[in-house]
Amino acid sequence: MNDNCIFCAIINKKVPAEIIFEDDQFIAFKDIHPIASVHVLIVPKTHFESINDIPDEDSTSLSNLFIYAKKIAKQLGLYESGYRLLINTGKDGGQTIPHLHVHILTGKINIPDQGK
């Protein structure tokens, strides 16, 4: 855990969030600034700053992230109609929170201008 990370604070229940799923590996909650009609974040409880920080030999963490994304999409009723998974990595990739997370999005998506 990282004391300066908002997602770690949500995991530790120090910051409120609208949690839709949680187990010992992941937490999923609604984005407080949604860019689509459905915008959920899936966050590993292990603090990785980005996908680049997952060790190559740790394929389980990454595969589980996508398995959970599929399960949560099904729970939200998006499985049949479709959804988008998005991972932003690094500043130029649009990452604003330095804790690995996957966005589940559906509907019209409004990606804000990032000053580029």
Model-derived features with residue positions:
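HIT superfamily nucleotide-processing domains
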Residues: M1-K116
